[in-house]
Amino acid sequence: MVLRIPHYFDSFVCTAGECRDNCCYGGWQIDLDEDTVEFYKSVKGDFGDRLRASIDYTDTYCFKLENGGCPFLDDDNLCHIYKELGPEHMGVVCTQFPRFSEYYGHYKETGIGLACEEAARIILEDTKPFHIVERTIDEEEFEDEEYDGLLCKGIEKVRNCLFDVMNSDMGFADKLSVLLDTGEYIQELINRNDYKAILEYVPRYVSRETLPYEEADIMEIWDTYDSMEVLNVEWTEFVKNLTASLHKDDYVRNLSGFNKENYPFTGYDKLVCYYLFRYLLQSVYDHDFAGKIYFMIANLILIKEMDIYIYKRDGMLTKEQHMECIHMFSREIEYSTDNLDTLSEEFLFSDIFCKERLESIVRTLF
């Protein structure tokens, strides 16, 4: 099997106790896989008893949190299971997070997620043009009846072209317009089962008039995202304050002031490449290529909105605050299956998620 990873993947090393929002104590649900639970059932002595008493067996296996944290953290926020049983007997979630993996025929794609602050730092501070590294690994090919090799080959080709667009010197708003055009056109080809035409597609920028910008459109996107499952109460409070403040007075002035600062650390282009790598090929299975593009663009719009709100509130935006916005947003949106499913439905049926309305926002914000 061939492993594909982003070029920055090997830079990641867990900072463990130094992490400010450690995934072991930040209120995260810590899921356990069946093999790990079965092993824990066999562990002898007091530690084995403690393991079994700490597992919640209802619905899905997970640890019962204590004060929002894993019950096996010591005073230095390090893992008792690691020390007592070794890393080979930690759950899959514990050993793999923030890594994610998807399988496409004889390819396995693995990356690191923005919900981890160290992973987010690596992604946003990277200075190289985005590219994928391939390695041969000793792992059996993943079989899925819904996998279509020809469609996958076409979407891979389109994705590589979009990476080239993002790595080019084209204006950022123009790049996002190319993504939106590509989303609409490739979706039409998928709907017609014209997979060979996908292989021939070359993204290009077409200058055109856009719809007049409507501030209500951004609020409609916020309403969609704010109606979903809440994983952290800080998110609810932040969005409440943002929507009550940012769009109540002189939004254009705040946006203009933020853009004039030209903060060098925002890395919005790097976020797009992250989303392209992580999500675009998933349309091989659900055939919703356009929805993946809308997801990327909507996420980018809201993350910039969060940045502008902090700029208005504090008179400035620090690199640390920007990183925290991305970290908080990713944790709420990307790490809830229910939220991702809800958004997938919205991208299919909600009028706000279309090329024309999203492009009018993009042209105003970026």
Residue map of PLM features:
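Compact, glycine/acidic-enriched structural inserts
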Residues: K41-R52, T127-R135
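Immediate flanking context of iron-sulfur cluster ligation sites
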Residues: V2-C19, R52-G91, K108
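General secretory precursor processing signal
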Residues: G17, N22, G26-G27, L73, ...
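Short runs of predominantly hydrophobic/aromatic residues within well-ordered alpha helices
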Residues: A16, R20, R159, M296-L300
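Hydrophobic, aromatic-lined core segments that form the binding pocket/scaffold
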Residues: G171-F366
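General N-terminal leader/first-domain-start detector
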Residues: M1-F47
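Short, compositionally biased low-complexity segments
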Residues: S11-C19, P129-E134, L271-Y275
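Internal, well-ordered alpha/beta segment that forms a basic, Gly-enriched binding/recognition surface
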Residues: N77, E84-L180
